[in-house]
């Protein structure tokens, strides 16, 4: 792509006009994934719409209820406010690809790419995040849960882009853990990613939100597990065994170069066991 093929809007209005004028042009921010289609797959692209000059997409705001992250902000730029509010995501952030990639890659791109093995969607699902979708005329806010409709397919409508990601802040009763399993510690894609967000009141489960990657065609939650544990004593072994069985029944992962389906199912079971152990109040242990 020559310089004449890159469109760089600087405002919401310019971006909406660019999308309307070039509906086939892909939107790119850091281009850390899209760029591979050109350098490795030799894809011929006539026009791209770059979001790198859209300062309005790079803001990060914290309210009393939530953290609102601009979809076009590089991951390294948002790492500090994100980890300040959600320190449990440190492993995911620090192991996300590599430092040069994190200087370019954006949270919005990681979501819009709709990869089943993206690192951040499982965490955002478990945290109950919402997306701000803009078309230049109005912004609609939808839950991330349900946004992924199929393999690399989303609820984005014609002319829309992700402008921000809104994440509710945690309470003192939230117990969150994020686990990434990959062949390499750094610069690798998840074989399995699992994130759990558990709320306990007097040892009783009042809420459970989940997020998973690498086990289905899209980033997923496990609604059956989330509903089945409500009202149960977390310390009970029933929670452990019920969770293992429901996770086994919920997903049908595939065999690929990163892991076999059997391995992925076993890892899910092991991670649930680990999470259950780590959150036993009378037997607090560190497994990291």
What do the predicted segments below correspond to?
Residues 1-288:
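C-terminal structural segment of proteins
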């Amino acid at each position: 792509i020559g310089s004449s093929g890159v469109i760089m809007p600087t405002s919401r209005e310019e971006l909406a006009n660019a999308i309307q004028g070039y509906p086939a042009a892909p939107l790119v921010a850091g281009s850390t994934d899209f760029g591979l289609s050109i350098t490795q797959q030799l894809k011929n692209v006539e026009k791209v719409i770059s979001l790198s000059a859209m300062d309005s997409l790079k803001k990060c705001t914290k309210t009393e209820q939530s953290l609102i992250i601009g979809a076009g902000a590089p991951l390294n730029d948002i790492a500090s406010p994100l980890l300040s509010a959600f320190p449990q995501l440190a492993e995911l952030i620090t192991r996300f690809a590599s430092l040069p990639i994190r200087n370019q890659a954006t949270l919005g791109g990681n979501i819009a790419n709709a990869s089943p093995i993206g690192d951040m969607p499982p965490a955002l699902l478990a945290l109950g995040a919402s997306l701000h979708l803009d078309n230049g005329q109005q912004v609609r806010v939808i839950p991330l849960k349900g946004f992924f409709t199929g393999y690399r397919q989303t609820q984005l409508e014609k002319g829309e882009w992700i402008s921000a990601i809104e994440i509710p802040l945690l309470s003192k009763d939230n117990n969150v853990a994020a686990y990434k399993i990959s062949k390499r510690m750094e610069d690798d894609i998840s074989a399995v990613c699992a994130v759990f967000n558990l709320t306990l009141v007097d040892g009783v489960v009042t809420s459970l939100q989940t997020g998973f990657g690498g086990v289905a065609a899209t980033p997923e939650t496990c609604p059956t597990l989330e509903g089945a544990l409500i009202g149960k004593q977390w310390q009970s072994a029933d929670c452990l065994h019920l969770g293992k069985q429901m996770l086994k029944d919920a997903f049908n992962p595939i065999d690929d170069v990163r892991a076999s389906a059997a391995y992925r199912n076993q890892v899910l079971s092991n991670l649930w066991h680990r999470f259950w152990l780590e959150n036993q109040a009378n037997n607090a242990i560190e497994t990291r």
